[in-house]
Design a protein with these regions (language model features):
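Phosphate-coordinating loops and pocket residues in cytosolic domains that bind phosphorylated ligands
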Residues: 35, 80, 126-127, 134, ...
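Conserved Rossmann-fold NAD(P)-dependent oxidoreductase catalytic core, especially the SDR/UDP-sugar
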Residues: 141-186
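Short glycine/proline-rich turn/loop motifs
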Residues: 32, 117, 121-123, 176-183
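NAD(P)H-binding glycine-rich loop region in Rossmannoid oxidoreductase-like domains
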Residues: 95-135
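N-terminal Rossmann/SDR dinucleotide-binding element
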Residues: 2-112
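Short amphipathic alpha-helical segments
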Residues: 51-53, 82-83, 126-128, 168-170
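SDR active-site strand-loop-helix element
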Residues: 41, 71, 113-119, 155-161
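Glycine/Thr-rich phosphate-binding loops of Rossmann-like dinucleotide-binding domains
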Residues: 48, 102, 123, 165-166, ...
Length: 187
């Protein structure tokens, strides 16, 4: 239940809402997403959920009409996280394990595949590094195969892993302004 409370608090958080507003008002070519379809894996993760929030707000506020197919493992988390969009015809959540082939006959062409699913938990890297990297490889292959089968113009992969760097030991929780250090040879 703690995760669900954090999700609700994030959506209602004024700093988070300010970040979303800064992004949608930034002079980016949002019109290139007009009447397009996106498939986003890792929908309930850091990058995926923020991107979905931005696109769905652009749909509501600016009539972008961009269909979002969102993939994730936990439907309950998705229902809580995206409750504001769950009934929209422009949003569809699909419960999916990135390790499995993704074959859907109910999805037509998709313009962009954004592969944002990855196990970024440090314990997983430490206790099962091969399983963790294998999931990343298989997941990427599955998304590329889907992109080809559905004639996507682009397929992009990204991760937020260690976006703040390692804790220097001077704080208990990370904040947006925190800049730790990143050591590329640590797992």
């Amino acid at each position: 239940i703690g995760d669900l409370v954090e999700v609700i608090n994030l959506i209602e958080n004024s700093m988070y809402q300010d970040d979303i507003m800064k992004i949608i008002t930034h002079p980016l070519p949002w019109n290139k997403l007009q009447n397009k379809a996106l498939l986003i894996s890792g929908a309930t993760g850091l990058v995926g959920s923020f991107l979905i929030d931005v696109i769905m707000l652009l749909n509501r506020e600016q009539g972008l009409n961009c269909k979002v197919y969102s993939l994730g493992r936990n439907e309950d988390k998705a229902k809580s996280r995206f409750s504001y969009s769950y009934e929209s015809t422009l949003f569809q959540f699909i419960s999916y394990d990135i390790n499995l082939p993704f074959v859907r006959n109910d999805i037509g062409s998709v313009d962009y595949v954004l592969h944002l699913a990855s196990n970024t938990h440090p314990v997983a890297y430490a206790t099962d590094p091969i399983g963790t990297i294998t999931t990343n490889i298989i997941g990427t292959q599955n998304m590329l195969e889907f992109a080809c089968a559905h004639h996507a113009s682009r397929c992009v992969s990204a991760s937020s892993n260690e976006i703040y760097g390692e804790n220097r030991g001077d704080i208990e929780k990370f904040e947006e302004k925190y800049c730790g250090y990143i050591v590329c040879y640590t797992i």
